[in-house]
C-alpha cells in the first residue's frame, strides 16, 4: 500500500495491463517510471502513457489495497508490444525538450484544453520560468466513451515541493503557441487530474507569436 518500488523480473516485456494482472487494483491506483505513467480505471483496466513494462526498468506503484504481484511468463513476441516511438516535434516547439534523468523528483498531470478545438499533433508543455519541465501529446485513445482529448504529462523538478509551474499549448493546425494563466505548485509524486477528470486549461495569458495580451477577456 502506498508508493513502493517494484522491479520487473520477466525476461521479456509485456503490456502493463497484463503485467499487473494479479494485483487487486482499484480506481486510482497508479504506476510510473521516470518517463511515463499509467492509472487504473475501474471496469477498463490500466491506461496511460506507460503502456508496457520492460526488463531493466524500475517502477513506482501506488495501490490502495495490499496484494501480491506475480508477473506472467511473457514470451519474446509479447515484448514487441512495447511501443518505442521517436517523436519529432514541430519546428516551432523544437525546444520543448526535457531530460527526465536530470531531475530528482517527478509528478503526473493529466490535462485538457477546454477553450480550444484541439486534435492530433497538438502538445502541452509545462515550464519553470523558461525551462521546459515536461511535455505531452494529444491523445483520445482511452477505452471509455468520451469526446475530449487529454494530455498525460510527467513534470520534473529538483525541488521536492513548492516550485511554480506554468503551461503552454501548441496548436498544430494553426502553428500557434498559447500561454495559459493556470499554474500548479510542484509536489513530488503528485497526481493531478486523470483521464476522466483532467486538469483543464482555459484562461489564456497570451498567444505567440503575436504575444498580444488578453487579460481583459481572460482575467486572472
Regions found by a protein language model. Give the residues of each.
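N-terminal exported-region signature
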Residues: 1-199
Amino acid at each position: 500500500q502506498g508508493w513502493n518500488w517494484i522491479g520487473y523480473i520477466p525476461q521479456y516485456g509485456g503490456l502493463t495491463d497484463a503485467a499487473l494482472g494479479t494485483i487487486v487494483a482499484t480506481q486510482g491506483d497508479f504506476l510510473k517510471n521516470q518517463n511515463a505513467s499509467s492509472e487504473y480505471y475501474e471496469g477498463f483496466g490500466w491506461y496511460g502513457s506507460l503502456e508496457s513494462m520492460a526488463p531493466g526498468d524500475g517502477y513506482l506503484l501506488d495501490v490502495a489495497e495490499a496484494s501480491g504481484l506475480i508477473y506472467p511468463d511473457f514470451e519474446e513476441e509479447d515484448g514487441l508490444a512495447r511501443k518505442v516511438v521517436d517523436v519529432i516535434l514541430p519546428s516551432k516547439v523544437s525546444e520543448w525538450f526535457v531530460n527526465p534523468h536530470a531531475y530528482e523528483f517527478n509528478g503526473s498531470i493529466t490535462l485538457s484544453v477546454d477553450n480550444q478545438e484541439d486534435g492530433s499533433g497538438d502538445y502541452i508543455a509545462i515550464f519553470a520560468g523558461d525551462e521546459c519541465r515536461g511535455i505531452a501529446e494529444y491523445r483520445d485513445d482511452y477505452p471509455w466513451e468520451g469526446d475530449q482529448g487529454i494530455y498525460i504529462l510527467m513534470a520534473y523538478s529538483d525541488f521536492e515541493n513548492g516550485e511554480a509551474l506554468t503551461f503552454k499549448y501548441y496548436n498544430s493546425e494553426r502553428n500557434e503557441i498559447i500561454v495559459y494563466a493556470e499554474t500548479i505548485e510542484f509536489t513530488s509524486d503528485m497526481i493531478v487530474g486523470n483521464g476522466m477528470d483532467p486538469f483543464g486549461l482555459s484562461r489564456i495569458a497570451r498567444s505567440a507569436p503575436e504575444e498580444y495580451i488578453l487579460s481583459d477577456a481572460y482575467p486572472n
